[in-house]
Amino acid sequence: MAEKILVVGGGGREHAIIKALKKSPDCGEIWCAPGNGGISYDAKCKNIKATDVDTMVGFAVEEKFDYVVVAQDDPLALGMVDALAKVGIPAFGPDKAAARIEASKVFSKDLMKKYGIPTAKYETFDDPAKVMDYIRAEGKYPVVIKADGLALGKGVLICENEQQAADGVKEIMLDKKFGASGNHVVVEEFLTGPEVSVLSFTDGKVVKPMVSSMDHKRANDHDTGLNTGGMGTIAPNPYYTPEVAAECMEKIFLPTIRAMNAEGCPFKGCLYFGLMLTPDGPKVIEYNCRFGDPETQVVLPLLESDLLHIMQACTNGTLAEQEVKFSDGAAACVILASGGYPVAYEKGKPISGLVDGQLPGEENVTVYHSGTAITEDGQLVTNGGRVLGVTATGPRLTNALSHAYEAAEKISFEKLHKRSDIGLRALKALAEKQ
């Protein structure tokens, strides 16, 4: 029977989830809250803040949704899945206790230390003076300072010297740039090596990893500029070999699920492993308790299995029996951002080149909407820092990348900013392998 589904969130990740869910024969009416302009071409949108748990749950009850996908980190940390369970609505995503794996860096680092999961050496602090005493005593730069709580992916500072570290501590702990998220900080050693993102499905018992991906966090080419939510992605990640995958499953993925069970907070949903392949082997840089953005925009287009069935198997504890299959191809996503992102940027710029939110006549290309709105007279306009993600799939990474960039050239808005080097590091790695 066709199911009525609500997706909570309003960015490119949610758009990718909706497009993948719609391929399921069991997916009926689909809604997104709050959604955005571009998502409204694919789903009915209801303007409720993702963090307004009570209103969202009330809406879910009123509209009699069969299943809710909580795609954003904030509502998960606020316990939206718990609140839905209380009114008898099944949901995809971890409960509040399990969502701490992302919502608190201190919780996740202490978890890894306790259960022997490889990660960077670290200390946690709630006193700014003690942070600087520790950093001076260690005397090693660069050093990484992380806000404990959620900070839209921007709460991590890499400090090259004592002055930068002092400025970073002031920004997070004294100026409260991220509010209460900066009451505690984690200070950790700087790791080197290729980064890999691995999203995984889990029902708290088994882990089924998705195809690996590589994010590009910095705003500008050659990995310069400020950290962003992500300026583009590719999948699969060439550094993530079958040997590395086997080691990660044995030393990181399964131990993490077992650790959460042992702590009395089993994790169900999408667990994202941010990894670094160091000279000492793979180590965890971060966990996210939900799909990554823009990793989702390259991972889900390669999924061949039924996403709705997989999600429900995670909720029901039946993932072991559920097929999770990805195509052998590749995908690349190029983010089109507003000029000035991730700091100050303007909104409301008309977007040209799209028809009903997509590029007409383009095969194997999908445009995912991160920050768009539709004006009263029907004009699609920019409405965020990251505006669109142009994803192309192909048999190989070279095809996917060239196609994504060709397609991106057909879209324009005032002060559009994109990186021109998405995937270049991955292509070099592939060339070295051959």
Question: Residues of each region from the PLM?
Answer:
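ATP-binding N-terminal substructure of ATP-dependent carboxylate-amine bond-forming enzymes
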Residues: 1-96
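Active-site "cap" helix and flanking loop/linker of ATP-utilizing ligase/carboxylase catalytic domains
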Residues: 249-271, 288-362, 375
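Short, charged, surface-exposed secondary-structure boundary motifs
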Residues: 40-43, 57-58, 100-106, 220-221
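Active-site nucleotide/adenylate-binding loops and adjacent lid/helix of ATP-dependent enzymes
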Residues: 6-7, 102-184, 214, 238-254
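Internal nucleotide-binding/catalytic subdomain
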Residues: 156-296
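Generic C-terminus detector
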Residues: 372-377, 381-434
